[in-house]
Curated annotation (Swiss-Prot):
Organism phylogeny: Bacteria, Pseudomonadati, Pseudomonadota, Gammaproteobacteria, Pasteurellales
Keyword Cell cycle: no
The reaction(s) this protein catalyses: (sulfur carrier)-H + L-cysteine = (sulfur carrier)-SH + L-alanine
Protein known as: Cysteine desulfurase IscS
Biological role: Master enzyme that delivers sulfur to a number of partners involved in Fe-S cluster assembly, tRNA modification or cofactor biosynthesis. Catalyzes the removal of elemental sulfur atoms from cysteine to produce alanine. Functions as a sulfur delivery protein for Fe-S cluster synthesis onto IscU, an Fe-S scaffold assembly protein, as well as other S acceptor proteins.
SUPFAM superfamilies: PLP-dependent transferases
The keyword Membrane belongs to this UniProt entry's keyword annotation: no
Alphabetized HAMAP family for the sequence: Cys_desulf_IscS (MF_00331)
Amino acid sequence: MKFPIYLDYAATCPADDRVAEKMMQYLTRDGIFGNPASRSHKFGWQAEEAVDIARNHIADLIGADSREIVFTSGATESDNLAIKGAAHFYQTKGKHIITCKTEHKAVLDTCRQLEREGFEVTYLAPKSDGLVDLDEFRAAIRPDTILASIMHVNNEIGVIQDIEAIGKICREHKVIFHVDATQSVGKLPINLAELPVDLMSMSGHKLYGPKGIGALYVRRKPRVRLEAIIHGGGHERGMRSGTLAVHQIVGMGEAYRICKEEMAEEMAHVTKLRDRLYNGLKDIEETYVNGSMEHRVGSNLNISFNFVEGESLMMALRDIAVSSGSACTSASLEPSYVLRALGLNDELAHSSIRFSLGRYTTEEEIDYTIDLVKSAVKKLRDLSPLWDMFKEGIDMSKIEWSAH
């Protein structure tokens, strides 16, 4: 067993060896290093063919047409292109957007920027299990609503939104529907030939591909139009200019190809280990799972350990790589905005740990993690006067703490 044990796959995944090997063939002069936009010689043709093959692999995994795949620098850019691109293109029809308070920052901050430009955004509060209330979503739609953005799987709590039902509501009201599928592609079956989704963001590195590459699915029928946010040579059908990073695209394509072949087996393995972890930790007193266990991706477990400070617990768990909150916000000492949106108090939000499992997680690592977490929580609670008071039956909420 190698230390520290990596249980932060929702932050990033190592590139699969097969992906890294494939990418190396597109970097040096012995390989295929051409610019796919060079149409007058073999170097360009070979590079273009490699990009086309990768585009097909990505489309195959999600049930799309390869012409609906636009390459970007990652899911953050895909979110920006989808939301800003659609908002700017359709703003003559209306300037109202709907999203959820638990979305990724790439969606929330993009919406905030649009608010500064004069758009109006409704931020829906999720139910306590993390799911969007469909009646509330329907009620939020106005005649001037042009776009809704709801993520498929949450990066912190792993809950799966019913994007089919939300998409149907959007179709009824002719609202464009964007889905951030960064955490669901390769973990859940997705068939865009059937799902009522217009725009979908994807990442390379969350599926054992390289960092710095992502894609945006843009529906052709019914056609969705976007205004570009990066201008230049008109690459990617004018939606995203810039020389295509062939080695990155090939890496992402290979990662998606592998996922299509191995997803069912891999998710069964990961879910079994996640359940083993959950069963090992659920009996610790004052332990709460954040988000629905029923509608949850198999790789995620987010637990709050009451009366334990999250940062102290992280330090006590030096042998395992986990996070409190998401990787994008885990450096801040603010409690997770996702958990606060579920209605958790600051104490519980602060004491949460996200375990995210992946392709290379083993049973041995999970058993070690269970033992380590149990002993760390016990040790920290033994040092906590709050835990003593709780055990004595004192109601914490009724105590008036004096300020010094």
